[in-house]
Amino acid sequence: MPNVRLTLAYDGTAYHGFQKQSGSGLPTIQETLERCLAELSGAALKVTGASRTDAGVHARGQVVNFVTGRWGIPTERIPAALNGVLPGDIAALDAREVPADFHARYSAVAKTYSYTLYNHPVRSPFQRLYSLHVPRALDLRAMRLAARHLMGRHDFSTFQAAGRPVQSAVRTLTRADIEAQAPLVRLVFRADGFLYNMVRIMAGTLLEVGLERLDPEALPDIIASGDRARAGPTVPPHGLCLEEVEYDST
């Protein structure tokens, strides 16, 4: 039976995260997608996501996979068929058949996330669902200096929220960029994996640096400490976006 890899974009505002919450009645991306797939296929299909994005988090490049029988829709036509039944805040971008052992989460070799700040004295009603309003001017140079210290292979326990224990908190961060196009500032992170709330805590820490509440040269000691209390706050979810999930050969 074909294993299908599907790329999605979504506005996470109205959803309680990606993962289905059995019996809760709360809308999630997974539940909505599975319901629409069932409408097209006439069968219950289980979807596996590359990232279990939290409530309010958005995606430009979420990847899922699901195994399906022959249902009369060519794989390349699945996005068009799905977009006919999906709500307007979710879009199917691409579909392809992949090997049977492909797993959207465990086959991923890298993920890229962005966190957007709206750096202007007056808030924007048009950006409020997709960025964090920061009215004070930011020291972008200091933020870039701090971001360099995040690069490389580290134990990122300092930037891990409680609730999802892992065997190892060691990750390799290959990108930590501060992109500014006033009034927007985008923090972009690429790594071989991320801990729970790691991006939001790193963003909160860099924001503290930008607001001159934290010395950028303190980052190495903060990372080495493994102490969550020494990092910055966990910024709200609505500024976060899953940009891309990468795989070796699919």
Curated annotation (Swiss-Prot):
InterPro entries (alphabetical): PsdUridine_synth_cat_dom_sf (IPR020103), PsdUridine_synth_TruA (IPR001406), PsdUridine_synth_TruA_a/b_dom (IPR020097), PsdUridine_synth_TruA_C (IPR020095), TruA/RsuA/RluB/E/F_N (IPR020094)
EC number: 5.4.99.12
tRNA processing keyword on record: yes
Reactions the enzyme catalyzes: uridine(38/39/40) in tRNA = pseudouridine(38/39/40) in tRNA
Keyword check for Plastid: no
SUPFAM superfamilies: Pseudouridine synthase
Chain positions recorded as substrate binding sites: Y113
Positions of the catalytic residues: D54
Highest taxon of the lineage: Bacteria
Entry's Gene Ontology BP terms: tRNA pseudouridine synthesis
Pfam families registered for this protein in UniProt: PseudoU_synth_1
Molecular function (Gene Ontology), one example: tRNA pseudouridine(38-40) synthase activity
Entry keywords, A to Z: Isomerase, tRNA processing
Family listed: Belongs to the tRNA pseudouridine synthase TruA family.
NCBIfam families, A to Z: hisT_truA (TIGR00071)
Subunit structure, interactors included: Homodimer.
Function summary: Formation of pseudouridine at positions 38, 39 and 40 in the anticodon stem and loop of transfer RNAs.
Name this polypeptide is given: tRNA pseudouridine synthase A
Native source species: Desulforudis audaxviator (strain MP104C)
